[in-house]
């Protein structure tokens, strides 16, 4: 039997995000981009590497699947 991995949503806390773009530069699949003052995430392109979460200087990005292990 094959076990399928189900993606869960990522969240960007707009109260913490300072729109510095660090997460954009960290993403190896270009799944994150800055649209004026909104961080957007293309979840189908996301490979759940966690680089954006770890690279965010304000801790604004979270995901249910990320537990601090890279």
Swiss-Prot record:
It comes from the Archaea. [4Fe-4S] cluster 1 binds at residues 17, 20, 23, 56. The keyword Transmembrane does not apply. Residues 8-36, 37-66 form the 4Fe-4S ferredoxin-type domain. Binds 2 [4Fe-4S] clusters. Keywords: 4Fe-4S, Electron transport, Iron, Iron-sulfur, Metal-binding, Repeat, Transport. Its cofactor is [4Fe-4S] cluster. It holds the Pfam family Fer4. [4Fe-4S] cluster 2 binds at residues 27, 46, 49, 52. One of its GO terms (molecular function) is 4 iron, 4 sulfur cluster binding. InterPro entries: 4Fe4S_Fe-S-bd, 4Fe4S_Fe_S_CS, Fe-S_Ferredoxin. Ferredoxins are iron-sulfur proteins that transfer electrons in a wide variety of metabolic reactions. PANTHER family: ADENYLYLSULFATE REDUCTASE, BETA SUBUNIT, L-ASPARTATE SEMIALDEHYDE SULFURTRANSFERASE IRON-SULFUR SUBUNIT. This is Probable ferredoxin TA0517. It comes from Thermoplasma acidophilum (strain ATCC 25905 / DSM 1728 / JCM 9062 / NBRC 15155 / AMRC-C165).
